[in-house]
Amino acid sequence: MRLKINALLTALFLVLLACKDQKPTETVAMANDTMEPENLIDRGKYMVDVLGCADCHTPKKMTAHGPENDMSRYLMGFDSAEGLPPVPENVPMGPWVLFKGDLTAAVGPWGTSYAGNLTPHETGIGTWTLEQFTKALREAKYKGLEDSRPMMPPMPRHYAYLTDEDIAAIFSYLKSIKPLENVVPGYQPPSTPPKS
């Protein structure tokens, strides 16, 4: 029995010794390393795609395969030129949500909210700083301004957990896309009928 224990301890010692001499594998650049501007923009595009920003911030066009993002209006938010159809009178206010067909506007118990213009035009985020953009995502502050109202649903609140590097990458990408002029209507509280 003692021989078996000694053999087991010796084997364990040799395994641990073998592990000690192993060199760590090469890792991908850490998030806190400084990225080149092109890589930051590429990372930002990746994040915008993965997070589904265009799902709500890009008007859709109907195709043979169903609705698709209208890339000529990429990330311009609710198209103010189209207006919002009226909420049907037979639909009572309640704990439900109605979306415009292209998902750029939502009506619910909080009121009516519109997807913002994320392009670098001055009617979008063109004049924003990285600090404002970070505050908008982290603290859900409208336009990233300290004393502003909260951003309204359906804007996801879990974006607050993005890293500083991911937010900077998203911001860099958004600042690199085509600027589109589009003044999005302001939020309307539930007592105000939706604009049509």
Identify the meaning behind each predicted range:
Residues 1-8:
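Bacterial N-terminal signal peptides that target proteins for export
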Residues 15-18:
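C-terminal motif of bacterial Sec signal peptides marking the signal peptidase cleavage site
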Residues 20-22:
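Bacterial signal peptide processing site
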Residues 26-49, 61-66, 83, 87:
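Electrostatic cytochrome c docking/interface patches
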Residues 100, 106-126, 141-165:
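Axial heme c-ligation environment in periplasmic c-type cytochrome domains
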Residues 127-142, 158-186:
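C-terminal capping alpha-helices of c-type cytochrome domains
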